[in-house]
Amino acid sequence: MDAGTVLSLTRVTADGCFGGGQLIPGYRLQLRAMAEGTVGLPSTPKLPDCEVPREVFPQEVFPQQTVAAMQRGVIQAMLATIAVAQQNSKGLLWICGGDAELLQTHWSGGTELLQLEGDLQLQALLDLAAGISSD
C-alpha cells in the first residue's frame, strides 16, 4: 500500500505478478473534499506534506470538535478499507508513503499483518535492477 495523496492498495500474487488493486482518496484529499464540497465544514489546519503529526490527531473516537471529527472519520475510513482488503487477501500488508506511519499507529489489526516500509518503492527498484543486471 502507498498511503499518499491516494491510498493505493496493490495486490501481488504468490508468483510476484500484479493481482489488481484499489484506490481511495488519501488523508488530506478526503479532508479537502469535505471542506470544499460541503457548506459549513471548515478547512482543516495546513499540515506538512511529509507527515501528520501525532499531536494534532484526535485521540477520541467520537471527537466533539468539527475538525477533529473530520480527521477521525477519515482515518477510520482508511483503516476500514485496509482491514477489509487484508481480510479478503489473507496476506501480509506492507505500507509506505507520507501517511503510512499515521495509519500504522492507529491500526489495530495486529502489527504482524501491517509492516511499515518507508522506502518500499526504492527497494523494489533495487530488486528489479539486480534482477535485470543478472540476466
Task: Go through the PLM ranges and name each one.
Residues 113-135:
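Glycine-rich phosphate-binding/hydrolytic loop that grips phosphoryl groups
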Residues 52-92, 99-102:
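Adenine-nucleotide phosphate-binding core of ATP-dependent small-molecule kinases
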Residues 102-109:
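Catalytic cores of alpha/beta
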Residues 3-5, 91-100, 118:
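Glycine-rich beta-strand-to-loop/alpha-helix junction loops that act as flexible
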Residues 20-70, 124, 128:
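Glycine-rich phosphate-binding loop plus the immediately following alpha-helix
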Residues 1-38, 72, 76-84:
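Phosphate-binding/catalytic loop of phosphoryl-transfer enzymes
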